[in-house]
């Protein structure tokens, strides 16, 4: 029983790992994706608080020095030695003897006191004289310093006076001479700047007016022209380059690139993608009138022999396809250089009143019948939603696709990067976003969808072509 439980647990773990692995893979057959939530984001690091300055006790104040006062020791003079006479009478009878001593002793003490007082007065006068002398010496020193300061101040005043006089002279010369000259120079510079600003404004105005029309290039255009490129090749125009065509004599001629080499030539290029230099995520009016660069010239040639990235314009495409039976050739190339094509024997685009509805038939080729049959990776209803035949043209500001929803944000053109005959949404997306390198993923797209230059029936949803072009030509019997 224990072995049975271990076996069941192992099988469950293996199934869980397999399910996790399968969910991490990108299913290339899914035409649309969703923007996942990125759960790998890290929390922003928080700043560490700075440690506070070190605080607390420090050194104590130094103790004040104690003056070693010298105590005065009273020195009492020793008493005079006694005068002792062997005979007391002798002392009386002899005044210069012991009695004189007694008299002197009687007067000695007051005299000593007077002398001490005089000494004290002399010391006091001496100290006062010393202090007075020191004070006079200090006053003398201070007077000398003041005299020196006065002299220094006089020197500084004289120096400042000289500097001020020089500065006044410089200011006078500057005001009287240089400033008028500088003002004249500044006026001249101002006039020059005003002239340049006016020229820039004029150039900007001219450039703005120029940019209202589709981009053009300066190339020598062949003299030969016609209703379309097929008529031009029949008139002798055999070089693939930019020509003027005029499908209707009541309208002005316009420039197109004619492919005179592919499958006997005579093809009018209505769309071309090759380097991502032109943004195809545009509104209804640019797609109606056309946009991009028709052709460019090679370095060694004076004519425009290289096609640019452009959309010819829905009005022009509709006019060309309604002249008569028209065939469509779609060529594409991957980033390895491999090429395939889709050829439709019938191709018609209705007028703007009918929302430029598209019709195709008679497919043959190697790319897969994406326009008529939808994405080959899908089945049933999902595949039906990717069929383009019969659809109206849609742009992100004119929603005519087959995606019926109450959410105005859900529309194919907005999510898939360009204007096209979207259903819900596409098997082919020639006007999508240009991705360098081919392979891309939902997290690289703007809305999490397969919005590249896609032809699902050849490379699936998550591979954007390096080159893709659409060319039309009147149907005629081939010899």
Swiss-Prot record:
PTM section of the record: Conversion of fibrinogen to fibrin is triggered by thrombin, which cleaves fibrinopeptides A and B from alpha and beta chains, and thus exposes the N-terminal polymerization sites responsible for the formation of the soft clot.
Keyword Glycoprotein appears in the UniProt entry: yes
Keyword Cytoplasm appears in the UniProt entry: no
GO CC term, one of those recorded: endoplasmic reticulum
Domain Fibrinogen C-terminal: 220-476
Entry domain remark: A long coiled coil structure formed by 3 polypeptide chains connects the central nodule to the C-terminal domains (distal nodules). The long C-terminal ends of the alpha chains fold back, contributing a fourth strand to the coiled coil structure.
Family matches, as Gene3D superfamilies: 1.20.5.50, Gamma Fibrinogen, chain A, domain 1
Biological process annotations from GO: adaptive immune response; blood coagulation, fibrin clot formation; cell-matrix adhesion; cellular response to interleukin-1; cellular response to leptin stimulus; fibrinolysis; induction of bacterial agglutination; innate immune response
Glycosylation site residues: 382
GO MF term (any one): structural molecule activity
Subunit composition and interactions: Heterohexamer; disulfide linked. Contains 2 sets of 3 non-identical chains (alpha, beta and gamma). The 2 heterotrimers are in head to head conformation with the N-termini in a small central domain.
Protein function: Cleaved by the protease thrombin to yield monomers which, together with fibrinogen alpha (FGA) and fibrinogen gamma (FGG), polymerize to form an insoluble fibrin matrix. Fibrin has a major function in hemostasis as one of the primary components of blood clots. In addition, functions during the early stages of wound repair to stabilize the lesion and guide cell migration during re-epithelialization. Was originally thought to be essential for platelet aggregation, based on in vitro studies using anticoagulated blood.
Database matches in PANTHER family: FIBRINOGEN ALPHA CHAIN
Protein name, as recorded: Fibrinogen beta chain
